[in-house]
Amino acid sequence: MLTEFLRDHPVRELLSGGTRVLFPPAEDRRAWEGIPEGYRREIRELAGKYAAVTWPARTASGFLAFVTTGSRRADEDPYFTRRRKLCAEVLDACLDPDAVMDDIVDGIWMICEESTWVISAHNVNPIPGAPAAAEYPLPDIRKPYVDLFCAQTGMILSLTASLLGKRLDAVSPLIRKRIREEIRRRILRPFMATDDFWWMGFRRKDLNNWTPWILSNILVCAVYDPMPRAKLADLLERACGMLDRYLDTLPEDGGCDEGAGYWNMAGGALLDCLEILEKVTGGKMAFRQDEKIRNIMAFPAKMEMGGGWFANFADCDARPFISGERLETAGRMLGDPALAALGIRMRGTVAAQLNDTPHLTRALDLIFHAPAEAAQAAEPGDTWLPDLQVRLVRRGGWTLACKGGHNGECHNHNDVGSFILFRNGEPAVVDAGNMVYTAKTFSAERYTLWNVQAEWHNLPIIGGHAQKQGRDHAARNVKRTPDGMELDLAGAYGEDAGIGSLKRTFALDESGLKLTDEGLLREAQETEWIFLLREKPEWENGMIRAGSLEIRCPEGLEFSAEEKPVTDARMARNWPGSLWRVHLRGRKTDRFRMEFVFSASGREA
């Protein structure tokens, strides 16, 4: 799409009417003094908090810990603390023209002195011919690699140099020169010189959020670098080719199999790239009417369960941080009032943009964004994403999210045919979602983690056999129905499960959900149904009661339940306390038709 446009519109000509200033520098006092007081106060508080934080050491032993112990935090804690502290102090210095620059200069110099801007978990990830991290656990500074956070560090330093340029020069002109050379050495030169980084799409086609996320930051680095227009044009054209390869991997329905939470740095990062291209070309590169782009931008609104909750299939958080400013901007840009309204409701804070992996451009987008008043949002409709095979249905106080797809998705969980059920905006039947990333998360040991296993999703287990991972283990005969979806789950299991067919049907109405499973097996086997519940379940006469939820079960099932205390820090943000796994064991048979009815508890009716 982008490359095709550039065939008839040379980038060098497009750049003649654009700007290379993405945000106002600190000396533009009118702009910085016009920032809303709430944001000004928050920035001052953040800067005060980080002023008390000593610049942490980033050590070789901390970097090595990813290989020696599996810990990412030993390297990432000091790594991201440095960058959060720098971002907070830079924003504060932009507000205060008399701010002392010493601590900021220390942070800049320290980051420039780092052997690598790549985090330990991404070391040599994966460059053709490079040894595995276990054999090569420290970075080779002769072979710079660009990962997510190397590019993001370049963005932070580029903006720091632009925002505080004259004040940094007053300390020493060598500071900005050092920033420029480090960005060129670590990011811009490798970007132009090699096709080997997997996220570029030359060597691999299975691209994900890495591509737009990295490119959005490289574009900031390039725009602020004083390179000649011809060189910038070459870089932008190369980046557009990579964005096209990323877009080619996405389905026409705009769905992101990484989950709504990953839209932030997938579709949201794509929006960053498109905005930068619009600005530097004076609006000549604009793709607002492209149907696929519109679908990508609207994806989070289609996945909302209500009240800040989202359908959290795969490695998505149930209550993810999504940039409300990006959502609102996308909604305004595309004329999508539902998307804009969601963004206004999720407007967020400066601190949220700097938490986790600090994103200075998003913080600047937020504070210079003139938010609209929250409009009365229309009632959300149903969602059907035919390529992703995800369905959301809303009836009365109930919201159902269910999926088909396959078990080789990005950030995959073995969850073909699983579902999530909310009542009155509160979770009832849930997906546990994500945990803190470790060395196991994206390794051959991924499926030893309980939260990704089929046995912890809302699925049947046939003769002791759960679903298997891999793209070939997929749903069949997936059909949208007026009130839900039907699909055959048999293909998601291995041949050893002996399943001829396993049809699952979802039907939601204002009274609740009817879930029907019909199985034909090659021989008589015991089937077990798993439901993961938010509240503690009780069993009485074929009925499960869990908080405000009631599940009427078929006859002849044996009930048991287990508490799963949520001890993982990331998961606990979504599910403090415990989750509860229900087991319903049936008798041996070679065929069955089982109907489960989920409704409001009679004690509340």
Language model segments and positions:
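Non-membrane alpha-helical segments in proteins
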Residues: F80-L95, D106-M110, A151-L159
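Short glycine/serine- and small hydrophobic-enriched flexible loop segments
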Residues: V90-C94, M155-S162, V220-Y224, G268-K279
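Extreme N-terminal leader/anchor segments
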Residues: M1-I43, A88-C94
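CBM-like, beta-strand-rich accessory domains located in the C-terminal region of large
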Residues: V124-P128, A151, G343-Q353, Y437-A605
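Active-site lining segments of carbohydrate-active enzymes
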Residues: E135-G259, D365-Q376
